[in-house]
């Protein structure tokens, strides 16, 4: 190729040569290196490319980066290529991390019209010591075994220093100079640093278990920076000790063969000073320990306590040898061995055995008390070395028997046994504790426990019995076994309320649901039988007929009663609620209680104006113009539905205009004039505010405006509205000085009626008491008059029924008898205190009249006396009129322990013979209904002068005259005191034997059945005193058997013949 062709036109060759040279010059490049420190301030000049490259800078020269670069780190000025630190500054750790060198490289192009140049720039960022070392944690725990050898290295966490080079981490050390450790800092092949804790000497945990050290890390800056951390070194235990027995290698122990199970033989407390599993010792039997010994003895693996696990028997084996091994639980466990020799000591251990098998209930589940008791094994008596009379107490067994079980019901089976033979094996058994159970022999060595009486759980719920089994050895051994019998409950008791009636008060307007009261009932039964529930017994309340359950409710579980509605006293004042308490048994038992809920009144009603009726809350009253002062104008009537103080009304007139001309009675409501209206023109109106208030707290009021209109003329002051004229006074009438009128209501009327009834009852009681007292005085006065008179036959006595006797109250009374006194025994002198005692009070009672007497009732007076018997004297009597015969004397009959006085007329009705009906005594078979048998057989012998009898009386029988008392002459020795007064209600006792009475008695048998009316008199002797009882004729009845009847004999009077008392000399009591 020719040059021309190659280079083109010859004229273009110089231009092409210039361009080639320029390109070659531009292709030349240069590397410029700068260095700066991190953390220099933004704008710091690093270098100028134009100066460092010795370039001529013209106006068109420009420096630019070849590619985009982070201008926040470095900036290049276009004019001369000056390099400065950017606004973000330079942070070597952020730009290069832990790299040994940190270089920022970039290309800068310098071009102008003359030349083009590429400059490679490298800026090295140098490190400064702006970071201190830092430990990852403030507390660094380290563990090292006490068996670790010297030189053991334990890795530690290396502190972190973000600086590099000399400013980075240079050393880590311990602050304590004298320590069994040191810290070594090493640099690995990859440049990373590591720290190790090096053990300088052997450790012993038993002497020191831990170390507390301080780590110090330091860099190489100027000045250097450092950091600290706490290093905790815990020494781990090593199994370097073996267990040790305090007893040594061989231990001997002696054990009685009757020792109970669980007895401690030996405490093998082997100790190991190591910690944790290394010092945790486990005890086991050695391989040479026989299996039988393993069953009889128990070795606690944790505590090493050797106890008795079974019953040993000296007769079977007397020595046991046990190998016990103690081993810790550390790695490479260490062991120790001890030989234990157990020697058995012989005792008399064969006591009787007792086995109790309770009777299981039919179909009882396995978990029931019946089945549990029946499944009890035979618990034999433990061997006991005891003297005669001693025994062994056993664990008891419990049986359950229903309380309704019949007598002779089977409760349990008791079996006894004894391992001994001969007399030592013969066992006797007994049951103690209660008579409701007994033992019944069943077969050899077995007994039945049966009930001996009916049971009641509420009285005795549990019986603690004792079974005693004793053998016949010498000395005998016995076994004592407690035995408990629990009585099962049956529903045989109904719930019982604490009281039959509960009284509750509640104020009216109570909120619904308010609590009223709580009723409580108790049921002594158990379980569901004693679980009480409550309910209301339905009943109708009031006239409305509503159910009581709409008023109150009762909590079935607690018995709390709550109100279901708000009560109103004006409609319901008392609510009677019956609550029924029922148990949960079958059949169910229940009982009722009455709860009386009283509703208390509250002031809940305002007064209501009744008359005159208001119109739109106002009243108008016409007042005559000629009315003067104190003239009644009107009467206001109001009512209040409340009661008591809440219903008491008060009236007031307020705000009278134009002047106060009227006043109203505060309690009467009567309006009167207080001034003169004669000068007022007709049509003049006076206005006032009527205020009606009740007495409640707070009071309720009602107001009305009253207009008083003055009218012409003198008409009646009548309110303009319609009203009853009777409520107003006539015009011109004056007010009388009377108090407020009473307001009668039902409670007040009831109170007045009750007060009047009580007054009448009290007056009747006083009248009766006064009458009885007057009769007592009359009786005492009559007795005194009789003693003042010379005798029964003396004159001067007023006739019976005379006016003076009637006035004194001593007139004749039908079927009434005077007191008969008999000679005393003379044991008490006539001046003794007992003889001078005053007579007691006398009581009177009404008794029905006797047959043949008057139709009116008779008075049977009650007398009691404490006077001694003064002498033999007989006092007259008065018989009932109308018989047409001479009054018959009374008959005194001795019944062996007391005297009986029988009227002569009534004695005819007695019979000493059998009635023929088979109710008599021996030798009393013949009947007698004539009434003379008693007269013939009552007295066998009488002294002449006392009885008017002759010799013919022994053959023909006694006449009526024989029965008359001797009253021939006056009593020359009257007693100084009133005669003894008799009691109608005292018991008869024996009298002293009469010294004048002979010892001949007549056997008179009186019939048991008395079908007659008579008056009989009992004589009561109390310390040789006598009391005679006067009674009205008895009603037909059964009399007890009579004792021997003795008749006292008295000397005849001087006349030698019995003289009947005159009619005019009789006195009545």
From Swiss-Prot:
The modification Phosphoserine is found at residue 1052. GO terms for cellular component: dendrite; glutamatergic synapse; plasma membrane; postsynaptic membrane; presynaptic membrane; Schaffer collateral - CA1 synapse; synapse. SMART domains: CA. The keyword Iron-sulfur does not apply. Enriched in brain relative to peripheral tissues, with low expression in the testis. Expressed in hippocampal neurons (at protein level). Residues 719-738, 777-859, 905-927, 1031-1069 are annotated as: Disordered. Calcium-dependent cell-adhesion protein. May play a role in activity-induced synaptic reorganization underlying long term memory. Could be involved in CDH2 internalization through TAOK2/p38 MAPK pathway. In hippocampal neurons, may play a role in the down-regulation of dendritic spines, maybe through its action on CDH2 endocytosis. This is Protocadherin-8. It comes from Rattus norvegicus (Rat). The gene is Pcdh8.
């Amino acid at each position: 190729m020719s040059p021309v062709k190659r280079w083109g036109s010859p004229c273009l060759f110089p231009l092409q040569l210039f361009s080639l040279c320029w390109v070659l010059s531009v292709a030349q490049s240069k590397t410029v290196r700068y260095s700066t420190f991190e953390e220099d301030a933004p704008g710091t000049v690093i270098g100028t490319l134009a100066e460092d490259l010795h370039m001529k800078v013209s106006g068109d020269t420009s420096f630019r980066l070849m590619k985009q670069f982070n201008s926040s780190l470095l900036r290049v000025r276009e004019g001369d290529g000056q390099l400065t630190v950017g606004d973000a500054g330079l942070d070597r750790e952020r730009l290069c991390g832990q790299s040994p060198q940190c270089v920022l490289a970039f290309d800068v192009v310098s071009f102008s019209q003359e030349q083009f140049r590429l400059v490679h720039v490298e800026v090295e960022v140098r490190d400064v010591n702006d970071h201190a070392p830092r430990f990852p944690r403030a507390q660094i725990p380290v563990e090292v075994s006490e068996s670790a050898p010297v030189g053991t290295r334990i890795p530690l966490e290396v502190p972190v220093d973000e600086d590099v080079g000399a400013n980075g981490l240079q050393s880590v050390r311990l602050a304590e100079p004298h320590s069994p450790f040191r810290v070594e800092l090493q640099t690995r092949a990859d440049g990373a640093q590591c720290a190790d804790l090096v053990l300088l000497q052997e450790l012993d945990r038993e002497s020191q278990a831990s170390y507390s050290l301080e780590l110090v890390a330091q860099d190489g800056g100027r000045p250097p920076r450092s950091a600290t951390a706490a290093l905790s070194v815990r020494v781990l235990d090593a199994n370097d000790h073996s267990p040790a027995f305090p007893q040594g290698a061989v231990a001997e122990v002696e054990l009685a063969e009757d020792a109970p199970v669980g007895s401690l033989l030996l405490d093998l407390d082997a100790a190991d000073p190591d910690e944790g599993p290394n010092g945790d010792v486990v005890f086991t039997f050695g391989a040479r320990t026989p299996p039988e010994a393993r069953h009889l003895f128990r070795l606690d693996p944790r505590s090493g306590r050797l106890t008795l696990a079974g019953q040993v028997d000296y007769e079977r084996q007397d020595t046991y040898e046990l190998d016990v091994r103690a081993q810790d639980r550390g790695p490479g466990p260490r062991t120790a061995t001890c030989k234990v020799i157990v020697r058995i000591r012989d005792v008399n251990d064969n006591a009787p055995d007792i086995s109790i098998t309770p009777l299981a209930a039919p179909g009882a589940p396995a978990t029931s008390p019946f089945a549990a008791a029946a499944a009890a094994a035979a618990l034999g008596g433990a061997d006991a070395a005891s003297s005669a009379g001693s025994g062994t107490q056993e664990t008891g067994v419990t049986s359950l028997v229903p309380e309704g079980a019949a007598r002779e019901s089977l409760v349990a089976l008791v079996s006894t046994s004894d391992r001994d033979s001969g007399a030592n094996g013969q066992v006797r058994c007994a049951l103690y504790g209660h008579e409701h159970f007994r033992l019944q022999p069943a077969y050899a060595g077995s007994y039945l426990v049966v009930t001996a009486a009916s049971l009641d759980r509420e009285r005795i719920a549990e019986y603690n019995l004792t079974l005693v089994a004793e053998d016949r050895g010498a000395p005998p051994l016995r076994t004592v076994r407690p035995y408990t019998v629990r009585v099962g409950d049956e529903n045989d008791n109904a719930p019982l309320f604490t009281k039959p009636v509960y009284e509750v008060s509640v104020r009216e307007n109570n909120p619904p649901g308010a609590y009223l009261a709580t009723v409580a009932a108790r049921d002594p039964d158990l379980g569901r039988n004693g679980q009480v529930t409550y309910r209301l017994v339905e009943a109708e309340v009031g006239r409305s007929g509503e159910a009581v359950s709409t008023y109150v409710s009762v909590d079935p579980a607690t018995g709390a009663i709550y109100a279901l509605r708000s009560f109103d006293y004006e409609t319901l004042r008392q609510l009677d609620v019956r609550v029924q308490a029922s148990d949960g048994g079958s059949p169910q038992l229940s009982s009722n209680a009455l709860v009386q809920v009283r509703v208390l009144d509250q002031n809940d009603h305002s007064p209501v104006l009744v008359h005159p009726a208001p119109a739109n809350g106002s009243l108008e009253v016409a007042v005559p113009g000629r009315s003067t002062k104190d003239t009644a104008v009107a009467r206001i009537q109001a009512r209040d539905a409340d009661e008591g103080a809440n219903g008491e009304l008060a009236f007031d007139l307020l705000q009278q205009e134009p002047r106060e001309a009227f006043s109203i009675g505060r309690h009467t409501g009567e309006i009167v004039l207080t001034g003169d209206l004669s000068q007022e023109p007709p049509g003049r109106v006076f206005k006032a505010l009527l205020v009606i208030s009740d007495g409640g707290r707070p009071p309720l009021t009602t107001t009305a405006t009253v207009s008083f209109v003055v009218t012409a003329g003198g008409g009646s002051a009548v309110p303009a509205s319609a009203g009853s004229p009777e409520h107003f006074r006539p015009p011109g009438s004056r007010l009388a000085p009377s108090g407020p009128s009473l307001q009668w209501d039902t409670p007040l009327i009831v109170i007045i009626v009750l007060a009047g009834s009580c007054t009448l009852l009290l007056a009747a009681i006083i009248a009766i008491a006064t009458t009885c007292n007057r009769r007592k005085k009359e009786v005492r006065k009559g007795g005194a008059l009789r003693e003042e008179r010379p005798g029964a036959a003396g004159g001067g006595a007023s006739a019976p029924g005379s006016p003076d006797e009637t006035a004194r109250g001593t007139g004749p009374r039908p079927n009434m008898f005077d007191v008969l006194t008999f000679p005393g025994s003379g044991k008490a002198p006539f001046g003794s205190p007992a003889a001078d005692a005053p007579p007691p009070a006398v009581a009177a009672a009404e008794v029905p009249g006797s047959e043949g007497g008057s139709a009116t009732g008779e008075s049977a007076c009650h007398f009691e006396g404490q006077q001694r018997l003064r002498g033999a004297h007989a006092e007259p009597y008065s018989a009932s009129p109308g018989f047409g015969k001479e009054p018959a004397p009374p008959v005194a009959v001795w019944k062996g322990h007391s005297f009986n006085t029988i009227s002569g007329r009534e004695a005819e009705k007695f019979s000493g013979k059998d009635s023929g009906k088979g109710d008599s005594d021996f030798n009393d078979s013949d009947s007698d209904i004539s009434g003379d048998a008693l007269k013939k057989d009552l007295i066998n012998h009488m002294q002449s002068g006392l009885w008017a009898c002759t010799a013919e009386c022994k053959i023909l029988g006694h006449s009526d005259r024989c029965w008359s008392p001797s009253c021939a002459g006056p009593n020359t020795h009257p007693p100084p005191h009133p005669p003894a007064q008799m009691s109608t209600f005292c018991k008869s006792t024996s009298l002293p034997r009469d010294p004048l009475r002979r010892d001949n008695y007549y056997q008179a048998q009186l019939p048991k059945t008395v079908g007659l009316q008579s008056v009989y008199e009992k004589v009561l002797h109390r310390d040789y005193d006598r009391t005679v009882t006067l009674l009205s004729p008895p009603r037909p009845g059964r009399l007890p058997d009579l004792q021997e009847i003795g008749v006292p004999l008295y000397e005849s009077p001087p006349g030698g013949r019995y003289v009947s008392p005159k009619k005019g000399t009789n006195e009545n009591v």
